[in-house]
C-alpha cells in the first residue's frame, strides 16, 4: 500500500504533526526537516522560509518528484532558498555567486534560448539578494564583495 504524499506534505508545511513518514520511509519529516530517503531535502529556517538542498533535490528521479510535489504544495507567500542545508551562509553565498557566473557563461554563448538563461540569472540573483538580507551577511566578507561584483558582470554580459 502506498502512502498519500499529499497528507505528509500538508502536515509538514502546516506543522500539523511533529513527525510523519510514508510507506517504507521514502519521504518523512521530523520537526522542521523533511527527508527524501533519509537525506535532508527541505528545512524550515523561519516561518514561510525554507531551504531546498540542491545537492539532494536532483539525486534521483523519485527525489526530484518529491521536490516538485512539495514545491507545488507550498503557498505562494513562501520563500525557498536553493542551497545546501548543512553549509554555513557564507559558503552558500559563494555557491550562489559561482552558479550565477556559470549561468552568465551559458547566457553569453546561447542563441535561441537567451531569454530563458536571462530569466534564470535574474531569478537566482534576486534569490541570492534575499538570502543575504535574510542572514544579514556582514558586508566586509569576501562573499558579500563577490555578490556586489556580480551586478557589474551581469551588466557587462548584457543580461540585466
What are these regions (language model features)?
Residues 1-160:
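Terminal leader/tail segments of proteins
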Amino acid at each position: 500500500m502506498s502512502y498519500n504524499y499529499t497528507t505528509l506534505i500538508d502536515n509538514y508545511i502546516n506543522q500539523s504533526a511533529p513527525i510523519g513518514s510514508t510507506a517504507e520511509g521514502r519521504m518523512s519529516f521530523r520537526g522542521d526537516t523533511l527527508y527524501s530517503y533519509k537525506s535532508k531535502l527541505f528545512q524550515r529556517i523561519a516561518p514561510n522560509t525554507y531551504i531546498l538542498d540542491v545537492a539532494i533535490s536532483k539525486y534521483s528521479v523519485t527525489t526530484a518528484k518529491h521536490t516538485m510535489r512539495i514545491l507545488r504544495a507550498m503557498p505562494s507567500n513562501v520563500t525557498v532558498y536553493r542551497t545546501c542545508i548543512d553549509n554555513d551562509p557564507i559558503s552558500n553565498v559563494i555557491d550562489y555567486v559561482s552558479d550565477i557566473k556559470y549561468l552568465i557563461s551559458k547566457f553569453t554563448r546561447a542563441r535561441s534560448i537567451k531569454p530563458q538563461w536571462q530569466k534564470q540569472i535574474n531569478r537566482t540573483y534576486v534569490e541570492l539578494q534575499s538570502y543575504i538580507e535574510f542572514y544579514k551577511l556582514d558586508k566586509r566578507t569576501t562573499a558579500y564583495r563577490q555578490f556586489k561584483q556580480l551586478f557589474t558582470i551581469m551588466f557587462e554580459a548584457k543580461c540585466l
